[in-house]
Amino acid sequence: MTNTNETIFALSTVFGKSGVAVIRISGNYALKALNHFHIKKEIKPRFATLVDLYDDSSQLIDNGIIIYFPAPNSFTGEDVIELQVHGSKAVIKIILEELSKVFVMAKPGEFSLRAFLNGKFDLTQIEGIADLIDAETKMQAKQAIKQISGELERLYSNWRQRLITIQSKIEAYIDFPEDIWAEKSELEKINNEVQSLVRLIQEHLNDNRRGERLREGLHIVITGEPNVGKSTLFNFLAKRDIAIVSEYAGTTRDILEAHIDIGGYPIILSDTAGIRESSDPIELEGISRAKKRSFEADLRIELFPFEQRPNINCNVVNSDTIYVLSKADDVINNHDIKINGIDLLPVSILKGIGTNKLISLIKEKAEEKFGHDRDTPVITRQRHRNHMQKALEHLQRFNIDNPIELISEDLRLAAFELGAVIGIIDVEEILSSVFSNFCVGK
C-alpha cells in the first residue's frame, strides 16, 4: 500500500492565506531538508530554531521555525522535521516545489499510517485522530479525545486477550487430552468465561448507535402543515436565513438542511414541505420527501398553529417528537399547554416566547440519544460494529459439547474480529479503507 522506505512530505495546515503554515517531513532522510534549504545552524532535537530557508539558487524563500523530532520519539516513529513558515500561498508553493526535488509527496493519511505501522497508535486511536480533526462540536471533540487516549483499544485488547487465554487452554487439550479436559470444573470455567464475553459484547452492541450518532449528528426534522412557521423556526435555530419565509403556503418544496450545535451536540436540522392535500406534482414530491425524512429522523419537532389549538388531534404520540404551538404571539406565559393529552410548547419567534425552553428540550433529547457523557467506551464506526457483530456470532456458536477443533476455530475467529478493530491483522484492504479518508499531511 505504501513504501515506508521513502521520505515523505506534505503541508499539514490548510492551503491559503494564514499567519503560519506547517510543513511536515518524515522518513529516514528527513534531515536532508537541512542541506537542501542551506540551513547551517545546529538543530537541537525538540527545540524550535529560527532559520532562513534558501532555494537552489541561494535565493531567500522565507525565514521560519524548524523542529526536529528524532525517531522513534515522533508522531510517525520516524525522523520528522516540521517547518513553520509564513502562511503565504507563494511561500508554501515554493517550499513544496523544493521538497519535491528530494522527497515524495505524501498520500492522504500516510503520516498516520506510518504511525500505526510503527506502533505509535492502534487503528481506533488513528480513527479518533480523524474524528478530532473533523469535530465541529464540544461533545464530538470529547468523544474523539477519549478514543485517541486508547479507551476502545484497551477494551477490545482485554476481550481479545481473554479469548486467547481460553483458546490456549483448549489447544493444550489437543496436545494433552488426558490432562485439562478431564476436569469438569475446568470445562465450566471456560464456558462461563465465554458466556461472560457474550454478554459484554451484546451490551456493547446494544447502545442505540450513540457513538456513531455523535460522529454523524442527530437528525432533527421540523414538520407540520403549510404556513405554520416551520421555515421561521428553522432559520431561528440555524441562526441565519436559509429558508424563504413567506405568507404563501407551500413555499418550501425541497428539504433544506443546516448543521447546528446545541449544547455541544451536533444537530442536522431539516426544514420540510408542509403536509397537506395537493394536486401540484412538484409539491406532492416535496410532501413525499418530507414524510420520508420525518420517518427516518432521530427526533421531530411538530408544529401546530396556536390559533387552531382546540382542534389539534395527534394520532401518534411518541417520545421522539417535540410538539410546538407556533406563532404564539399572544400567549400570556410560556408554560406547556395540554390538549387532548398532548403537552405542547407555545413558541413565538417574533416575541422570543418559548424559544429558550425549546432549545433546552432539544438538548435534553440529544443527551438521551447520545447517552449524556457516558464513561464506558462506545462504538463510533460501522466498521467496529461489523467486526464486533461477527465476533459475537462466533462466540454464540461456541458449545462445549462440540468437537474440540470447532470450539478452537470459533474462538480463533472471534479473536480475529476483535483484532481487526484495533489493527492486529494483516489485511491491507482494511488499512486502505481507514487511511484513505485522511487529509494529506495527516
Swiss-Prot record:
Residues the entry annotates as binding (6S)-5-formyl-5,6,7,8-tetrahydrofolate: R24, E82, K120, K442
What remark does the entry make about the cofactor?
A: Binds 1 potassium ion per subunit.
* Residues at which GTP binds: 227-232, 246-252, 271-274
Q: Where does Mg(2+) bind?
A: S231, T252
> Which InterPro entries does the UniProt entry name for this protein?
G_TrmE, GTP-bd, GTP-bd_TrmE_N, GTPase_MnmE, MnmE_dom2, MnmE_helical, P-loop_NTPase, Small_GTP-bd
Primary enzyme class:
hydrolase
Might you give the EC number(s) for this enzyme?
3.6.-.-
Among the GO molecular function terms of this UniProt record, one is: GTPase activity
**In terms of domain of life, where is this protein from?**
Bacteria
**Subcellular location as annotated:** Cytoplasm
Q: Which residues form the TrmE-type G domain?
A: 217-367
Keyword set for this entry? Cytoplasm, GTP-binding, Hydrolase, Magnesium, Metal-binding, Nucleotide-binding, Potassium, tRNA processing
Q: Does the keyword Cell wall biogenesis/degradation apply?
A: no
Function recorded in the entry: Exhibits a very high intrinsic GTPase hydrolysis rate. Involved in the addition of a carboxymethylaminomethyl (cmnm) group at the wobble position (U34) of certain tRNAs, forming tRNA-cmnm(5)s(2)U34.
Alphabetical list of NCBIfam families matching this protein? mnmE_trmE_thdF, PRK05291.1-3, small_GTP
Its subunit composition reads: Homodimer. Heterotetramer of two MnmE and two MnmG subunits.
Protein name as annotated: tRNA modification GTPase MnmE
UniProt lineage: Bacteria, Pseudomonadati, Pseudomonadota, Alphaproteobacteria, Rickettsiales
- Gene field: mnmE
